[in-house]
């Protein structure tokens, strides 16, 4: 998927985290470049 900013992340139902995705979530893209990940629940 082409999630590369926080707006697209929100559209896909995700949220931005500066560390790795917590708990039962998976990374679906990035928010503000590489370090900040866009995560979403399974």
Swiss-Prot record:
It comes from the Eukaryota. The keyword Secreted applies. GO terms for biological process: cell chemotaxis; defense response to bacterium. It is found in: Secreted. Disulfide bonds join 9-38, 16-31, 21-39. Neutrophilic granules. SUPFAM superfamilies: Defensin-like. Keywords: Antibiotic, Antimicrobial, Defensin, Disulfide bond, Pyrrolidone carboxylic acid, Secreted. Pfam families: Defensin_beta. GO terms for molecular function: CCR6 chemokine receptor binding; chemoattractant activity. The modification Pyrrolidone carboxylic acid is found at residue 1. Its main location: secreted. Has bactericidal activity. Active against E.coli ML35 and S.aureus 502A. This is Beta-defensin 6.
């Amino acid at each position: 998927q082409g999630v590369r900013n926080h707006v697209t992340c929100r559209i896909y139902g995700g949220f931005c985290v500066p560390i790795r995705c917590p708990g039962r979530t998976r990374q679906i893209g990035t928010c503000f470049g590489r370090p900040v990940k866009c995560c979403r629940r399974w």
